[in-house]
């Protein structure tokens, strides 16, 4: 009886437990919500990073050397740093301050037609900046205009920072020393930023050059610390500073973007020194210590040096230049950048025209063969000849372009004799002088000088000044009317007239037109002369209609 009862209880308990185990659990209570409250939208999917814009496609530095052809320097034009003027905005006075005519599109057309393919435009900036380092807009606009003249005819153009470097302790604010770099780095980088932004959209035919001939604190030429008797520590610091300036230049230009991201850039050795010669063991140090700047793009940096060998002994010149070119290949080209000789000419005094033409033709041809670019320093169309325009040294110009293009090339070389001309002279200052002759005059062969103006000056405005063969020997000639003849007095001057000028005697400047100038030989025959600026004036050749 009990056992049956107990079995029923156990069975009931077992059944109850089983039912409870199989009964589903109540769901958890939901949080109360406000039906009017908006449910936040899920976070948006992150947008993919935009693809970087492709860099412009520019020719490499080596291709630029080939494509630019042979070059010339528009010297003493946009780089004057002392002219007696203080207003850095007045570009015309600065551009003509060192005796050159105002640059024109016609001049660049002439250079192109003669066979030149590139123009280096030296530019000074420090005298054209305000106290905050901002370039005056008037000056930047003029630089831009001259650059456009070059590019308009399909030539290449190089612009730089020029006489902000060099030997002038007062005006050359860029110095190759660690202290100089630390002191002027911000101003230097800010200047290049302004230039780069102005020209960032220009194409591959515009190149930037970092600095011209930067020297150490001792203003040493040839190699760093030369003027100090050589101090290895000073020299090392100077070469490091050159590399630092070059790196700053590349970094700043690249950061401005646009076409500047791949523009071909030129960096110069210390002092633009080329390592030529064997008279000192340190001569090659500027080449050995020059480093290729780090760059975001490959093959868009060129090196630059300058070269002015003596050419009285042509065989010696060729040996020296050949060794120089070998060294440029060894120390610079081997780093992955081509070389341009951004200035070349000669330090020989009064070299023969025959020697100069031989040198010019050989130098350009040999550099071309080696893939080295060349830019002759001035001395082809200078001073008033640019205003025609025509060549002042036509034989040298022809030698240069034939050295590059070959003897079969026929250049267009206009000369002054092709034109009927007058000379427009602008005097700026009291005592300014115009050269009436281009060289000294032997008084044993010549008896006087005669000239004609377009109109008579006022009495006392001008006189002729003749410099004798010694200091203090001077003859003065007064005149009135549109023409004058001055007879030389050997008892006053001696055997030679070193210089003959037309001098201004009034304040406030004056503009005159000289129609012709002739020396009078002892036999009475006339020899034409070409007037030119001596100081304080400019000359523009005006072609007669």
Predicted stretch roles:
Residues 416-496, 505-541:
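Extracellular ligand-binding interfaces
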Residues 351-418:
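Aromatic-rich peripheral "rim/lid" segments of glycoside hydrolase catalytic domains that contact
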Residues 56-276:
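Active-site mouth of glycoside hydrolases
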Residues 1-20:
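Sec-dependent bacterial lipoprotein signal peptides
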């Amino acid at each position: 009886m009990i056992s049956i009862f107990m079995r029923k209880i156990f069975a009931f308990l077992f059944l109850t437990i089983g039912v409870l185990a199989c009964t589903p659990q109540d769901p958890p209570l939901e949080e109360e919500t406000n039906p009017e409250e908006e449910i936040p939208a899920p976070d948006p999917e992150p947008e993919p990073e935009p693809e970087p814009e492709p860099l412009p496609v520019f020719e490499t530095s080596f291709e630029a050397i080939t494509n630019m052809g042979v070059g010339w320097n528009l010297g003493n034009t946009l780089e004057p740093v002392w002219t007696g003027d203080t207003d850095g905005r007045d570009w015309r006075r600065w551009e003509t301050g060192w005796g050159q005519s105002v640059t024109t599109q016609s001049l660049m057309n002439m250079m192109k037609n003669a066979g030149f393919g590139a123009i280096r435009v030296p530019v000074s900036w420090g005298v054209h900046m305000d106290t905050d380092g901002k370039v005056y807009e008037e000056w930047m606009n003029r630089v831009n205009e001259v650059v456009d003249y070059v590019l308009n005819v399909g030539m290449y153009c190089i612009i730089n920072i020029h006489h902000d470097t060099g030997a002038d302790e007062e005006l050359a604010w860029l110095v190759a020393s660690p202290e100089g770099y630390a002191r002027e780095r911000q101003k230097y980088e800010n200047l290049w930023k302004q230039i780069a932004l102005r020209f960032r959209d220009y194409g591959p035919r515009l190149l930037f050059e970092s600095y011209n001939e930067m020297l150490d604190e001792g203003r040493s030429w040839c190699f760093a610390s030369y003027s100090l008797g050589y101090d290895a520590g000073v020299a090392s610091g100077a070469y490091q500073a050159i590399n630092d300036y070059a790196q700053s230049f590349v970094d700043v230009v690249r950061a401005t973007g646009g076409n500047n991201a791949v523009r071909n850039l030129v960096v110069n050795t210390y002092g633009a020194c080329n390592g030529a010669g064997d008279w000192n063991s340190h001569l090659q140090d500027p080449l050995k210590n020059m480093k290729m700047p780090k760059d975001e793009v490959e093959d868009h940096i060129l090196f630059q040096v300058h070269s002015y060998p003596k050419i009285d002994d042509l065989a010696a010149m060729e040996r020296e230049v050949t060794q120089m070119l070998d060294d440029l290949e060894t120390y610079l080209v081997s780093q992955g950048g081509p070389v341009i000789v951004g200035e070349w000419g000669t330090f020989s005094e009064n070299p023969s025209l025959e020697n100069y033409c031989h040198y010019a033709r050989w130098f350009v041809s040999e550099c071309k063969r080696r893939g080295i670019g060349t830019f002759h320093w001035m001395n082809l169309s200078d001073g008033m000849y640019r205003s025609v325009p025509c060549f002042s040294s036509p034989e040298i110009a022809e030698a240069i372009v034939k050295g590059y293009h070959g003897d079969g090339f026929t250049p267009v070389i206009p000369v002054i004799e092709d034109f009927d001309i007058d000379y427009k002279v602008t005097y700026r200052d009291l005592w300014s002088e115009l050269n009436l002759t281009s060289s000294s005059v032997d008084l044993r062969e010549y008896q006087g000088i005669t000239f004609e103006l377009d109109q008579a000056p006022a009495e006392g405005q001008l006189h002729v000044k003749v410099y004798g063969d010694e200091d203090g020997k001077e003859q003065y000639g007064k005149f009135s009317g549109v023409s004058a003849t001055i007879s030389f007095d050997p008892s006053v001057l001696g055997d030679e007239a070193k210089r003959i000028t037309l001098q201004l005697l009034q304040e406030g400047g004056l503009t005159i037109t000289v129609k012709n100038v002739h020396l009078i030989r002892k036999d009475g025959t006339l020899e034409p002369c070409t007037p030119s600026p001596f100081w304080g004036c400019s000359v523009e050749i005006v072609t007669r209609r």
